[in-house]
């Protein structure tokens, strides 16, 4: 298993949660990046408010750490309604979901993170709730059991997932607003780092914010985490101000290189290059070679490496690109 304290892992760490809440934007106008998504949401939200209706159900998908939870909260704020949050693995029984649904008020947002991990029995309850705002409940057991329907107030379900392909087709089809989040560019990440530094009361210059941003793997959660670690270095080794020099030395000390890679990324790429002659190599063989689970490679390590053009997926397996060889100052065989 990948180490839980990996500094640049995009998944939420315990220490991230409280700090990230303070840094989260509350409204769309405060939200940086994802321009197409923001533009779409502004239209959908304004239209729903003009009609005095609940916003259509929304599926937000993309790699971890890009702001799916933040967007769900912004939607609730923009609509002026409450939000109740849960996650797929927590909803083990139909009654767990029923308890949440029956406590919603008109227009409220129900946010389900990791919605691809809903159990089939819970998913079945969700279908009529999403389509008809009705809840089917079984009363009694055996031959005497009967179904009753409860009317629900109009509500908005916001589902978030890193694996949209793992959703069943019937569930996916019930979301009227699908939104894909992409990795952030360095300019937008620099803006996020600067804003977070202001919230934290830190002194940071443009070059310092840029240095942190370019090593943050296109992910705001990682950018904020690196900012906190660079702050520690700046306070202990310097005068507390974060410059390009300070950020560069701090991140080198933390073993986060100029591309935002750490030892796990380098281990993966070097395994393809050295052990499998650049590939192609199947996912199971690659997982065995680096001692990780295939899901970890698919969900955590690969997305950014593929997006940046360091490895490729092919029908025959993973291959290291010329850019991967260049990163290690190696010559790619012809």
Swiss-Prot record:
It catalyses: ATP + H2O = ADP + phosphate + H(+). GO terms for molecular function: ATP binding; ATP hydrolysis activity; four-way junction DNA binding; four-way junction helicase activity. It is found in: Cytoplasm. GO terms for biological process: DNA recombination; DNA repair. Mg(2+) binds at residue 69. CDD domains: AAA. GO terms for cellular component: cytoplasm; Holliday junction resolvase complex. Keywords: ATP-binding, Cytoplasm, DNA damage, DNA recombination, DNA repair, DNA-binding, Hydrolase, Nucleotide-binding. It is an enzyme of class 3 (hydrolase). DNA binds at residues 294, 313, 318. Residues 258-334 are annotated as: Head domain (RuvB-H). Gene3D superfamilies: 1.10.8.60, P-loop containing nucleotide triphosphate hydrolases, Winged helix-like DNA-binding domain superfamily/Winged helix DNA-binding domain. Its EC number is 3.6.4.-. Its main location: cytoplasm. Residues 4-184 are annotated as: Large ATPase domain (RuvB-L). Has 3 domains, the large (RuvB-L) and small ATPase (RuvB-S) domains and the C-terminal head (RuvB-H) domain. The head domain binds DNA, while the ATPase domains jointly bind ATP, ADP or are empty depending on the state of the subunit in the translocation cycle. During a single DNA translocation step the structure of each domain remains the same, but their relative positions change. Homohexamer. Forms an RuvA(8)-RuvB(12)-Holliday junction (HJ) complex. HJ DNA is sandwiched between 2 RuvA tetramers; dsDNA enters through RuvA and exits via RuvB. An RuvB hexamer assembles on each DNA strand where it exits the tetramer. Each RuvB hexamer is contacted by two RuvA subunits (via domain III) on 2 adjacent RuvB subunits; this complex drives branch migration. In the full resolvosome a probable DNA-RuvA(4)-RuvB(12)-RuvC(2) complex forms which resolves the HJ. The RuvA-RuvB-RuvC complex processes Holliday junction (HJ) DNA during genetic recombination and DNA repair, while the RuvA-RuvB complex plays an important role in the rescue of blocked DNA replication forks via replication fork reversal (RFR). RuvA specifically binds to HJ cruciform DNA, conferring on it an open structure. The RuvB hexamer acts as an ATP-dependent pump, pulling dsDNA into and through the RuvAB complex. RuvB forms 2 homohexamers on either side of HJ DNA bound by 1 or 2 RuvA tetramers; 4 subunits per hexamer contact DNA at a time. Belongs to the RuvB family. HAMAP family: DNA_HJ_migration_RuvB. This is Holliday junction branch migration complex subunit RuvB. It comes from Shewanella sp. (strain W3-18-1).
């Amino acid at each position: 298993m990948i180490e839980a304290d990996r500094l640049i892992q995009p998944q939420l760490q315990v220490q991230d949660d409280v700090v990230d809440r303070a840094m989260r934007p509350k409204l769309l106008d405060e939200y940086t990046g994802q321009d197409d998504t923001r533009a779409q949401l502004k239209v959908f939200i304004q239209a729903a408010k003009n009609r005095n209706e609940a916003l259509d159900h929304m599926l937000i998908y993309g790699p971890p750490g890009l702001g799916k939870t933040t967007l769900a909260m912004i939607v609730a704020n923009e609509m002026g309604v409450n939000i109740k949050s849960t996650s797929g693995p927590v909803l083990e029984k139909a009654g767990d979901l029923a308890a949440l649904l029956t406590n919603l008020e008109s227009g409220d947002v129900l946010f389900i993170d990791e919605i691809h991990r809903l159990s089939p029995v819970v998913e079945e309850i969700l279908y009529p709730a999403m389509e008809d705002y009705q809840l089917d409940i079984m009363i009694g057991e055996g031959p005497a059991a009967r179904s009753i329907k409860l009317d629900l107030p109009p509500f908005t379900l916001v589902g978030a997932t890193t694996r949209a392909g793992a959703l069943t087709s019937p569930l996916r089809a019930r979301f009227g607003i699908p939104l894909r989040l992409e990795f952030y560019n360095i300019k937008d990440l620099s803006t996020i780092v600067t804003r977070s530094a202001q919230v934290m009361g830190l002194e940071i210059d443009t070059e310092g914010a840029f240095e942190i941003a370019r090593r943050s793997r296109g992910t705001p959660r990682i950018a904020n985490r690196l900012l906190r670690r660079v702050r520690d270095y700046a306070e202990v080794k310097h005068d507390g101000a974060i410059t390009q020099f300070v950020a560069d030395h701090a991140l080198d000390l933390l073993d986060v290189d100029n591309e935002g890679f750490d030892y796990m990324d380098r281990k993966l790429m070097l395994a393809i290059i050295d052990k499998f002659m650049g590939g192609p190599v199947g996912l199971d063989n690659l997982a065995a070679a680096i001692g990780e689970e295939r899901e970890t490679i698919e969900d955590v390590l690969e997305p950014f490496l593929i997006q940046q053009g360091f490895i490729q997926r092919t029908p025959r397996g993973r291959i290291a690109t010329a850019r991967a060889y260049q990163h290690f100052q190696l010559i790619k065989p012809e």
